[in-house]
């Protein structure tokens, strides 16, 4: 066989009687456990051939289908048992049932396989149908494109035919003009017509067309003969210039278009096909069978190209020319290149449409070595742009803030607004109590220690119906920045002075802030109900600070009030409203909101909360606000009593929720048009803040390094603090206060001052820096508290600011090294020197002044010059050790490690005492 398998002869000669016996016998159990239902088996062997001459003999079986026995007896015999009539045993019955079960399973598997093949065939048919449908759609699309292309070519052919008709009309007009000129020439100089014969000279087609006109103009009229035109036609045909082999059969068709021939005898003109315009003028005449001398001389016999091909060629040439023009050094495209303060070399090359290598080469010529990823400053980039011949446009990063404040308001749009009044004065002079009396609230009771430590804004309605906005500022000396912020946003300053206390340091500071803000002052002399109150003393003390009240001939209003007894409150409101009318306060409510951040904090449940004072426009819920370096969409607007409002007009203090972070107190806020603008401005301001911090760190690095070196050397110590407060203003005030407590030997370093709860990251920072956490009106989270206990970090909670200052001062004093001072004890004169074997030299001395103590410091003076300074090792009187020897007594002295003693030397005794810091 060709496949390498050979049938053994023994397998071919297998007797068939075994098969007949199998067909006649019934189902039986084989020893191997394999069941066969009446099939004959032909056994044999096959030799398989492999590569490299190898072969192998394997045994094979050929199964043949069983032949069904005819008649009912066969089935009965199969059901009833063997031929002998013996009943089936249980094992045979079980084997038969298993065989039947296997057959059913095989049939079910075969049916499932056929069903799966059917599904696969149907899926393949569906895929083929879809592919055919897609091919049909593609072919239809291509046919539509071909039809559109043919239509465009036909349109071009029609346009070409129209152009040819126009050219023929122009040619005919030129011929008529030439005929008129020839007629005029003939009239002026008549000649013999026979002398004008061509004489065998072949003329061009335009000349032949003009010849009949010239002959009629020159020769006299003759009687018309019927046979002359037919005879003249061959003559004219013989005189025509033939340049192509098929031109003789054309006759006048070469000179005149075919449609002019008409009549029953004229042969039908062949249908004209639209021809594409040729690259030269004679292409269409060559197609129609006519030609002029110019085309014949040029000899343009090339095949005509299609319009699409010509258009593509022209586009390629135009693009190539433009590319060559751009690449050439002589022609450059001048661009407007926008250059910021800093730009990378790659970005600069991209904006100039130049190669990065060329830009780097230009920088190298300028002495600047830079890679494509490095940044260069704007001045260097400007030189590069000018070197490349472009126009530069310098921009700054701060340009993102251009136009953020809007335009100036029109005077017609301004409307009266409520005055903003800031209450200032010394601590415990009753500022908050006065505001509580005006608002009929009790804010002072909620403040820790009875002093104001937050800046608050409130709005009240006077009995006249007009509104007044009050800003309460702290009076403690630590809150200087808060008072400055309050004075900067105010219209009127109410200076509260206690009648029993007079002008105090913070009162003077408040006067300076008010004058710096150029705000009018109204003096409120409070606590007039207390015994010992003297308002006139207050007025006189104010004269020392250039505050002259009206009672003393000045222009500053003063009101005597009592917040506790509610005396003079209505008069104070009248003075405020009168002053606001004099100032003529107005604002435009119909514009985007602008204002200032009064205070800010981080609330655990609500997130960043900012107290805003609207100065212009109207702030609404949903506006996008940029406050300092933070931005966000306003989610809620709350008034001073915690009620939600939809909008806030000018001079209205509100709290807003929805900012991404805690803005700085005193920062301006403004409403912008979209999120992208707000995010851009916020990122720019945050970047500026980081750059400023980095610059300050670099500037202070030398001092800081020196301080750390002194700390490591033990010369200087430090107190590291991490401040966490409830509001931004308190954090600033505490940071400023503790830094003023630094000692020349102990430095106070504030690692961070922020708002919000104490978190695990704060504990880790304090642990790494060995710092103490100062918590002002905030608490630590559960996880942070557990971590602090494990790490041993000290967290100190405060609610009053002067307690913070006192504790930090004690910490600083505890780290200050105690000072030592020398205390003089007395003098002793050396009168005799004894040499003791074990002890060395011992000086016998007489105490001339003071006393001598054992273990004190001594100086040995010889001729009033100190020759030794050390300690006294032994002090004896006779042979007994004593603690001290007074004046007028003799004693024996020995010095530790020194024996150069002489008679007449003086011993000065002293001791060091510790002075607490």
From Swiss-Prot:
Biased composition (Polar residues): 10-27
Basic and acidic residues bias spans: 282-305
Ranges of biased composition (kind: Pro residues): 265-274
UniProt binding sites for GTP: 425-432, 472-476, 526-529
Region (G5): 562-564
Spans annotated as G1: 425-432
Primary site of residence: cytoplasm
Cysteines engaged in disulfide bonds, as pairs: none
Recorded GO CC terms: cytosol
Compositional bias of kind Low complexity: 69-84, 154-177, 227-236
Domain tr-type G: 416-586
Stretches the record annotates as G2: 450-454
Pfam families referenced in this protein's UniProt entry, alphabetically: EF-G_D2 (PF22042), GTP_EFTU (PF00009), GTP_EFTU_D2 (PF03144), IF-2 (PF11987), IF2_assoc (PF08364), IF2_N (PF04760)
Family under the similarity heading: Belongs to the TRAFAC class translation factor GTPase superfamily. Classic translation factor GTPase family. IF-2 subfamily.
Function in brief: One of the essential components for the initiation of protein synthesis. Protects formylmethionyl-tRNA from spontaneous hydrolysis and promotes its binding to the 30S ribosomal subunits. Also involved in the hydrolysis of GTP during the formation of the 70S ribosomal complex.
Name of this chain's protein: Translation initiation factor IF-2
Annotated source species: Gluconobacter oxydans (strain 621H)
Gene name of this polypeptide: infB
